[in-house]
Amino acid sequence: MYLVREYLADSYVIDADVYINRNFIVTDINKSTYFSAYKRNVKNEWKLCFDENKKVNDIEIINGDGFILCGVSYWSKNDGILIKNRIEEVIKMDDFTNLYWDDIVKNNLKDLDVRIKEINDDDIYEIDNIEDLNMVKDIIENN
């Protein structure tokens, strides 16, 4: 993320390990948003905790069920600039060995205005291993 930090403001981020089964990308968006599906029986996934206004107030790593990070997000101009600045600070401290870029968001939620947009559980699939890849292949072939 460091290499593209200048482009975060007013931009979508789509992780490279996801298959989008239905286009849920919207053009009329102005608040930072995690697109999230409710997934069951997940292992070591990042769960979004949010209030009645859909404002994300925490991210927990869980085993079980919940609305999880699905690999698609949008970042407003202000939030994108803040994330860029925090990424630069972390790089300067040279302490980023086991750091995901989403850790920057997680650790700065109090300073960000991030919402959740709920999507269907079959709208997106994360491909972490050959089993996931084969499952997505079956979905594509059977549609």
Positions of predicted regions on the chain:
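Conserved beta-loop-beta/alpha segment of the NTase-like Rossmann-fold superfamily
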Residues: 1-46
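Structural signal for conserved beta-strand scaffold positions within catalytic alpha/beta enzyme cores
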Residues: 34-37, 58-61, 116-118
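Short acidic/glycine-enriched loop/turn segments that link adjacent beta-strands
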Residues: 42-44, 66-67, 121
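Conserved active-site beta-strand-loop modules that form the wall/rim of enzyme catalytic pockets
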Residues: 46-47, 55-57, 71-75
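Short, surface-exposed charged micro-motifs
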Residues: 47-49, 115
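Short acidic-glycine loop/turn motifs at beta-strand connectors
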Residues: 49-55, 110, 120
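Short, flexible, basic/aromatic active-site loop/helix in glycosyltransferases
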Residues: 50-66
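Conserved alpha/beta core of the MobA/IspD/sugar-nucleotide pyrophosphorylase nucleotidyltransferase superfamily
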Residues: 69-143
